[in-house]
Swiss-Prot record:
This is Lysosomal phospholipase A and acyltransferase. One of its GO terms (molecular function) is calcium-independent phospholipase A2 activity. Inhibited by zinc ions at neutral pH. Zinc ions in plasma may keep the enzyme from hydrolyzing inappropriate substrates. It is found in: Lysosome; Secreted; Membrane. Changing residue 398 to A: Loss of glycosylation site. Slightly reduces production of the mature, active enzyme. Its EC number is 2.3.1.-, 3.1.1.32, 3.1.1.4, 3.1.1.5. The active site is at 198 (acyl-ester intermediate), 360 (charge relay system), 392 (charge relay system). Changing residue 85 to S: No effect on phospholipase activity. Strongly decreases transacylase activity and association with membranes. Keywords: Acyltransferase, Disulfide bond, Fatty acid metabolism, Glycoprotein, Hydrolase, Lipid degradation, Lipid metabolism, Lysosome, Membrane, Metal-binding, Secreted, Signal, Transferase, Zinc. Optimum pH is 4-4.5. The gene is PLA2G15. Has dual calcium-independent phospholipase and O-acyltransferase activities with a potential role in glycerophospholipid homeostasis and remodeling of acyl groups of lipophilic alcohols present in acidic cellular compartments. Catalyzes hydrolysis of the ester bond of the fatty acyl group attached at sn-1 or sn-2 position of phospholipids (phospholipase A1 or A2 activity) and transfer it to the hydroxyl group at the first carbon of lipophilic alcohols (O-acyltransferase activity). GO terms for biological process: ceramide metabolic process; diacylglycerol biosynthetic process; fatty acid catabolic process; glycerophospholipid metabolic process; phosphatidylcholine catabolic process; phosphatidylcholine metabolic process; phosphatidylethanolamine catabolic process; phosphatidylglycerol metabolic process. Belongs to the AB hydrolase superfamily. Lipase family.
Length: 412
């Protein structure tokens, strides 16, 4: 509650006390009432929140596949759907279909996919609703926030989205995100801290670059970036060429490749020329080398020409030279062998030999450090924090990460 002094009572206060009260009112931070912590919005990365699907399909790829369901079911993450044979059903349902005419994606016939839990944290705390440790994602961080006095679904909320798509196809999501931020500002008396991981940072940057500076100054207190692929990631070329099963032995890389290629967000995360040298060879074969200037031929040679169109659709979505326009805390992992380039004896349908560089195991250090360029391009602070030995996913539960986040939210 605010301090209300009735006019006829003011004269009864001693001069010293009146001066003290006025001084305290002037010095109070108008952005956040005393004793309150800033509300938090969590933005997950690629594969970083649950998806649900409902089926009414004209045909199926295998007699074991469900053709029709009465209600929505979890399509990501449900480990049972990734078993041999059943995974064919899963891929046919979760893939996107690219329309060359409209330059947009759509769901397969008879499949409807939705994102559960916008404004809640459950769909990004655990990717698997059974809450198995395999699917644990933001859980440790949210538990820490609760321990610091936050409440799930109130002053800490999740902003899940359809991570298969790039931002240009998720317009309603950004409208909902803006509305939620404004609502939290009103409910909790101050600007919001955005905490994003991996590709969620690119989504957040896309969002912030499209908001007026006055809006950002009012509603955003800080942006905490974890493992951001600002300049794209080298491993994307391997994902597109031969697939990547993320070391899950029951999933064949070529099997999962179809789904990975159909997600426009995959091509969006290819390395960018504002971070990488145009001379750098990312993929080497016995007959040809591919740099970032060779993407069109790369897509032709892997038999996925729609990928070149997807890249053209998404390459300019984020303006590299345009800073977010808010206080930025850029946390990045180092010291973990990270795929840097690939050599294929047989291209593209066999696993390559991998040359490693520095990074967090997924995001190359060169890409993560792109945020340094903004230090001279905005008035707001851009602070970098190295996380030595911190792997891309594990950094969310890293003690250093959590201690840093606590300082941002609650002070020293």
């Amino acid at each position: 509650m605010g301090l209300h002094l009735r006019p006829y009572r003011v004269g009864l206060l001693p001069d010293g006390l009146l001066f003290l009260l006025l001084l305290l009112m002037l010095l109070a931070d108008p952005a956040l009432p005393a004793g309150r912590h800033p509300p938090v919005v969590l933005v997950p990365g690629d594969l970083g929140n649950q998806l649900e699907a409902k089926l009414d399909k004209p045909t199926v790829v295998h007699y074991l596949c469900s053709k029709k369901t009465e209600s929505y079911f979890t399509i990501w993450l449900n480990l049972e759907l990734l078993l041999p044979v059943i995974i064919d059903c899963w891929i046919d349902n979760i893939r996107l279909v690219y329309n060359k005419t409209s330059r947009a994606t759509q769901f397969p016939d008879g499949v409807d996919v939705r994102v559960p839990g916008f404004g809640k944290t459950f769909s990004l705390e655990f990717l698997d609703p059974s809450k198995s440790s395999v699917g644990s994602y933001f859980h440790t961080m949210v538990e820490s926030l609760v321990g610091w006095g936050y409440t799930r679904g109130e002053d800490v909320r999740g902003a899940p989205y359809d991570w298969r798509r790039a931002p240009n196809e998720n317009g309603p999501y950004f409208l909902a995100l803006r509305e939620m931020i404004e609502e939290m500002y009103q409910l909790y008396g101050g600007p919001v801290v955005l905490v994003a991981h991996s590709m969620g940072n690119m989504y957040t940057l896309y969002f912030l670059q499209r908001q007026p500076q006055a809006w950002k100054d009012k509603y955003i207190r800080a942006f905490v970036s974890l493992g951001a692929p600002w300049g794209g990631v080298a491993k994307t070329l391997r994902v597109l060429a031969s697939g990547d099963n993320n070391r899950i032995p029951v999933i064949g890389p070529l099997k999962i490749r179809e789904q990975q290629r159909s997600a426009v967000s995959t091509s969006w995360l290819l390395p960018y020329n504002y971070t990488w040298s145009p001379e750098k060879v990312f993929v080497q074969t016995p007959t040809i080398n591919y740099t970032l200037r060779d993407y069109r031929k790369f897509f032709q040679d892997i038999g996925f020409e729609d990928g070149w169109l997807m890249r053209q659709d998404t390459e300019g979505l984020v303006e590299a030279t345009m800073p977010p326009g808010v206080q930025l805390h850029c946390l990045y992992g180092t010291g973990v062998p990270t795929p840097d380039s690939f050599y294929y004896e047989s291209f593209p349908d066999r696993d390559p030999k991998i040359c490693f560089g520095d990074g967090d195991g997924t995001v190359n250090l060169k890409s993560a450090l792109q945020c340094q360029a903004w230090q001279s391009r905005q008035e707001h602070q851009v602070l970098l924090q190295e996380l030595p030995g911190s792997e891309h996913i594990e950094m969310l539960a890293n003690a250093t990460t959590l201690a840093y986040l606590k300082r941002v939210l609650l002070g020293p």
